[in-house]
Amino acid sequence: MAKPLTDGERRKQISVRGLAGLGDVAEVRKSFNRHLHFTLVKDRNVATRRDYYLALAHTVRDHLVGRWIRTQQRYYERDPKRIYYLSLEFYMGRTLQNTMVNLGLQNACDEAIYQLGLDLEELEEIEEDAGLGNGGLGRLAACFLDSMATLGLAAYGYGIRYEFGIFNQKIVNGWQVEEADDWLRYGNPWEKARPEYMLPVHFYGRVEHSPEGVRWLDTQVVLAMPYDTPVPGYKNDTVNTMRLWSAKAPNDFKLHDFNVGGYIEAVLDRNLAENISRVLYPNDNFFEGKELRLKQEYFVVAATLQDIIRRFKSSKFGCRDPVRTSFETFPDKVAIQLNDTHPALAIPELMRILVDVEKVDWGKAWEITKKTCAYTNHTVLPEALERWPVSMFEKLLPRHLDIIYAINQRHLDHVAALFPGDVDRLRRMSVIEEGDCKRINMAHLCVIGSHAVNGVARIHSEIVRQSVFKDFYELEPEKFQNKTNGITPRRWLLLCNPGLAETIVERIGEDFLTDLSQLKKLLPLVGDEALIRDVAQVKQENKVKFSAFLEKQYGVKVNPSSMFDVHVKRIHEYKRQLLNCLHVVTLYNRIKKDPTQAFVPRTVMIGGKAAPGYHMAKKIIKLVTSIGDIVNHDPIVGDRLKVIFLENYRVSLAEKVIPAADLSQQISTAGTEASGTGNMKFMLNGALTIGTMDGANVEMAEEAGAENLFIFGLRVEDVEALDRKGYNAHEYYNHLPELQQAVDQINSGFFSPREPDCFKDVVNMLLNHDRFKVFADYEAYVACQAQVDQLYRNPKEWTKKVIRNIACSGKFSSDRTITEYARDIWGAEPPALQTPPPSLPRD
């Protein structure tokens, strides 16, 4: 049993966490009790902490369902345009606290749970993260769902219910080891299975042409079982749906291949079909080309399009003709957003349904498809672009291959007519890439089949137009747009940093939570002594709390008055965790050289997962942990420098570390990070940014003033110029003694005395084939870090910059991003009228 709390400690739990909301404490207690006994069939003598969490989850869920049902009824009655957000990743994190925040139930639940002798925060920690994403792309989808619900859009997230999400990361002897993420082991109280909407998905087979049309025959069928998760808007009684598909084998699966006695084998082989939704592919910004992954991509698209068309056909105003559905109005009623190229098969699949099944003629079907679909590009790295072998399509999706060939032929005919004789342009713009292995370029398919293509930050959209899709931009410039990414301020401020949220509410009220641009009202208060004191105090409390967490979780003691220098994101060469490592080694060498000098104490925290097959990324983790082993145990260094690798970085850990950070590292090579969203979370939570002019950093500097960030390094133009000249890492190595010393130490085994050769391949890469030019930015980076130290010595000036950054972060709300998508791409207006709460009559 936990030791009894003092009265003072108890009262701390009754603080205004977030804002006053609805909910009656007695009712919450009653509901909790009922669920513990009737849903979980436990009494207090045998109930575990997890039972208490589940009882609370069911209690909170009860407050959702009335609003959920009411929202769907309202959509049926009003028949607004539906938005379908298709993504292979939704990185949702935990649901309990977010639901309490959005329904305004947090205070009632906190008090009720306290009265029952339990601790709300302890119960929240029991929930598993829904880790159905790798990083930024999946988390963006989750933020977008929150914003679409908060804006009252009739939106649906569609994806896959992976049985195993992103792996859990363990660090063993400094190396990453992956463990399966069995997140559904104890059940998921937030989802509702919908077997009545199960749908068939076809694979393999052959194509038959006849006078009646084209048929796809002799296919293998897998069933798609939908699981619905509610997505509540912020205090607006709207609850949208995220529908995730799970693969099920049909009951007759393989039983028609019945050889004598083959029954058991056939039943065991059901696993093969059900493997489609077994596991999330753990690659971020890297294309692997596995058949199972292509199956996943078609699986989600085929099930979702059937569902969309079913809903369109049964909608009040969707189809006027009683005999046969008219698809004329389809693009007026349906918008499909493709989150990267992963759901690109929506384009040929919609064509297949319209042409083969609904008998719409090709030209009309193509017009409908283009008007319906829009594509978001998320990366410029060539190794990330999806290029599937034609041979794989031929086997797995023969009809779709035919359709893609036909789409490509018409497209190339159009280009040839506009640019006669320009054969190279045809080659560059084709969906089919010729060569030893013919491939399908999914990005080209998306651009051709969509009415809008957007990048995710201004600089990225410019690169998309001028480089990645240059030829396509020349063909249809009006198609290309920018939609700078954003984050939901509900999860990324109110939920994770209630102290800061409360400090802001005291100054400007709470409207900023649904209109983040109102943070501008803090600008006149940048010099306000009381605000400076409060903001600094909240940050210090967050640091103390995170320090306690680190000690409990990892057994590491850190100095909470040191600068918390945080670099958390997927481990990838382009994100340049190696540049951070070189700075840490340089700081270490400076302390060792002159231990008496005044030194700003730093705790450097690096966290993130490496793709299991990405050797260099795994080496980078080993390097960070090895540097930590030496630095953290050096008595001369003492408390002045600590290096910590944050194991198993995920949404729930981000919610703890981001509010505690002083410095946010956003140091990708200019022109490689499409946008980034971690940068925005740190800005909103009162950290200052050290970064390159890349992704959304550019717009952050524009909003807050470049002098309020620590900007360093090559710009995109400089990187291009250096590429033309030829990047020579040896020049920097030979001319910068501190860089040379650091590199030599890493190379010689100074940080890996038991394996002196451990990092030779890393150094070899840095010196001889570093695509991301780490050494070229080293000098500017180290100088910029010295400016960081300089400002940190003056806490008041530091905090003024923090307040200015917070005040200027309003642009980076996903509410603003989604409002722009709705206006410029989807042609959907957020409704003027709110959904009435379940307690009121429907209209």
From Swiss-Prot:
Keyword Glycosyltransferase: yes
GO biological process, one term: glycogen catabolic process
Site (Participates in a stacking interaction with the adenine ring of AMP): 76
Known cofactor(s): pyridoxal 5'-phosphate
Reactions catalysed according to its record: [(1->4)-alpha-D-glucosyl](n) + phosphate = [(1->4)-alpha-D-glucosyl](n-1) + alpha-D-glucose 1-phosphate
Electron transport found in the keyword field: no
Annotated spans, Pyridoxal 5'-phosphate: 677-678
Gene3D superfamilies: Glycogen Phosphorylase B (3.40.50.2000)
Post-translational changes noted in the entry: Phosphorylation of Ser-15 converts phosphorylase B (unphosphorylated) to phosphorylase A.
Positions bearing the site annotation: Involved in the association of subunits: 109, 143
SUPFAM superfamilies: UDP-Glycosyltransferase/glycogen phosphorylase
A molecular-function term among this protein's GO annotations: glycogen phosphorylase activity
Modified residues (N6-(pyridoxal phosphate)lysine): 681
EC number: 2.4.1.1
Sequence positions bearing Phosphotyrosine: 197, 473
Function according to Swiss-Prot or TrEMBL: Glycogen phosphorylase that regulates glycogen mobilization. Phosphorylase is an important allosteric enzyme in carbohydrate metabolism. Enzymes from different sources differ in their regulatory mechanisms and in their natural substrates. However, all known phosphorylases share catalytic and structural properties.
Subunit (UniProt): Homodimer. Dimers associate into a tetramer to form the enzymatically active phosphorylase A.
PANTHER family tied to this protein: GLYCOGEN PHOSPHORYLASE, GLYCOGEN PHOSPHORYLASE, BRAIN FORM
Protein name (database record): Glycogen phosphorylase, brain form
Provenance organism: Ovis aries (Sheep)
Name of the gene encoding the protein in the UniProt record: PYGB
